[in-house]
Each structure stands twice: as C-alpha cells, then as structure tokens.
C-alpha cells in the first residue's frame, strides 16, 4: 500500500469514528488543544518544586497517604484554598464526617463556596463524586478518605460478617468509571488514604494503603506524607515537622522529597519553607544562628526570621520569586530501587 493509499485509509477510518462517537473522539496528539499540563499549587513551595510542574496536575487522580495526624487533610485544605484563589469551584466528600469548618477557614478556604457532602456509604460517596465530576463545573474534588468508603453490603450486614475484598472491588469499579470523566472535565480528583500493616511480611516494607491496588495504578501522582518531629516554643508543642515524598509521578521525575512545617491552627508555614529553600539555594545566608539576605541581617534563630518574613511580605515574596526561578537546581532525588514503581 502506497503512502497516499495509507493516508486515505486512515482519513476514512477517522471520519467513520468521528461519525459514530462525535467530533474530537480521535485525533493526532499534536492537534490536542492542551498539550502542556496545567497545575494547581499545593500551598507548599517545596512540594510544588518536588512535583516538577508547580503543583498537582489538572485532570488527573492524586493519592495522598500517610499515618494518622501526619497532615493529609491539612495539605488537601491548602489545595482547595489555592484552587479557589484561581477562581476554581471545589467539593469535599467527607466520608469520615470529620471536617472542621473553622480550621478550613483559618487555612484560607472559602467555606461559603465549598461544596460538601457527608455520605452514608461508599457507593453513595463515589456516585456523588461521579455526578459532580460529570457536571464539568467542578475544578477539584477531595475524597476523605478511602478507608471510610464502606460498601453498603458491609453497613447492612452483621458485625463480624466476612466481607472479602468488597472495598477493593468497589474502588476498582469506581475508578474505571471515573477516569475518563476526570480527564475530559480537567477535574483534579484527590483521594486521601490511610496506612495499614501487612501481616507476615519478612522482607521489605510491611506498610500498605487501604482499598486494594486499583488506586495505585490509576493515580498519576502519589504523595507520602509523614510527621518527623515536633516544633516547640519552650515546652509547648506548636507544630509538626513534616516530610513529603512523591513516590509516583507520571508528569515529572518521581522520588523527590520536600520538608515543611505544619503549624497548629495556621497550616503549612510558607515562611519556614522560604528560609530552608533560600539557604539551600544560597539566596539566604546562614552564619551560626544568624540569617542574612543581601548582606542585611534579618534575624537570629529560625522562628525569629519566620516572624520577620511575616511582617515584611515584600521581602518574603522577593525571595520566593528567586527560589522558583532557581528551583531547577534542586536535585533532591532519592532513587531508592526498593520503592520504585513500574506502573
């Protein structure tokens, strides 16, 4: 078959597909209107850099998992606040029935515009999510959490009844149904997940996430968040030191890490990240306990410098801008072969 005949055959096939399934159902990749991946900031400067595109990608599934009280919900509330700043409409499926509106407001969430649902069953939660995504009016939807998506059969059954893999089947079926809608509507879909321990594991990590393996495959980005220490003011604990690892990333190189402070009552400390990344990139000078910017001392001790940056937002914004410009120099990639995922 000559090249001309091939082109005619392909054109006829494409015309037939478009006639059957509508215009735009098949095309050459270069003809797609959005080639570049759009992103929404996570509210963490370090995590935005670690993700490689400046935040979480639009039209993709994101999984955020970690131990209890590690900052999972805090991170998702920052995501909502950032999406709302860009004029986005967000929804929160609160399957755990534990969302605190006062805390969400402190983190910058416009609670008057946030759509919330507190479903009774896993099927109901995922059907609500599906309807909202298909509406094309939602920019971001949070499902908190996968562990709380209890199948109807389990709720209606007796305590102690065996429900073998019913939640995993529910998640697998839902994700098959949701994936196309999420991509078509450009909706960011974030699943919060919990960690469980596998019994009888002799080698490797015994940790696993709930809901089976489907979410691991369908997620474009998987973020592991851990509390690694406490922040104290004298004897009082005022926050948590947090480490985040991007364990899977389909839009940029994975296995990058970021550290930030989560302050109780106010969320992720932007100023703390600016100090740490500024020092790492030689934008802020550190000599002993003193910090300087452009040869001017801005404070002694990290907490005092954080306060200085809060009081001088123009300097904070200036340093942040330089950090983002130099962010390509950060190469904190941990290629741990035992944690690599091939999917």
Curated annotation (Swiss-Prot):
InterPro entries: AAA+_ATPase (IPR003593), DNA_recomb/repair_RecA (IPR013765), DNA_recomb/repair_RecA_CS (IPR020584), P-loop_NTPase (IPR027417), RecA-like_C (IPR049261), RecA-like_N (IPR049428), RecA_ATP-bd (IPR020588), RecA_C_sf (IPR023400). GO terms for biological process: DNA recombination; DNA repair; SOS response. ATP binds at residues 66-73. It comes from the Bacteria. Its main location: cytoplasm. It holds the Pfam family RecA_C. It is found in: Cytoplasm. This is Protein RecA.
